[in-house]
Amino acid sequence: MKEQTEVGKLKEGKYLLVDDEPCKILSISVSKPGKHGAAKARLDVVGIFDGVKRSIVQPVSAKVYAPIVERRNAQVISIAGNVVQMMDLESFENFEVTVTDDVKDRIEAGKETMYIYSMEKRKIDFL
């Protein structure tokens, strides 16, 4: 799910869709409007799920999409290799998430953890 917004209304720490990937905004710099053009905004973002840094330049009045990012709670059912099977505590839906070794060391079966859900993707989140 996504919603439309203007580049000028975005703030650091919010989310933005870049190349159909939900990204967190790290920094925004806005140039002054010139004699023959509108103000431009440079956004430095990092992908939530892939960790890739991206940079885009858009006019401040341009329309962009902001993904709806939800933080939900789930119970870890089992851990097999780098795949963690989890159950959402609200909808009782079972799903699998691929994790890295450092995340795998911080979770254990039977415990509750928080995860990020956006654009039909999931990732375990530690605050």
Swiss-Prot record:
This is Translation initiation factor 5A. It comes from Methanospirillum hungatei JF-1 (strain ATCC 27890 / DSM 864 / NBRC 100397 / JF-1). The modification Hypusine is found at residue 35. Functions by promoting the formation of the first peptide bond. GO terms for molecular function: ribosome binding; RNA binding; translation elongation factor activity; translation initiation factor activity. The keyword Glycoprotein does not apply. It comes from the Archaea. It is found in: Cytoplasm. One of its GO terms (biological process) is positive regulation of translational termination.
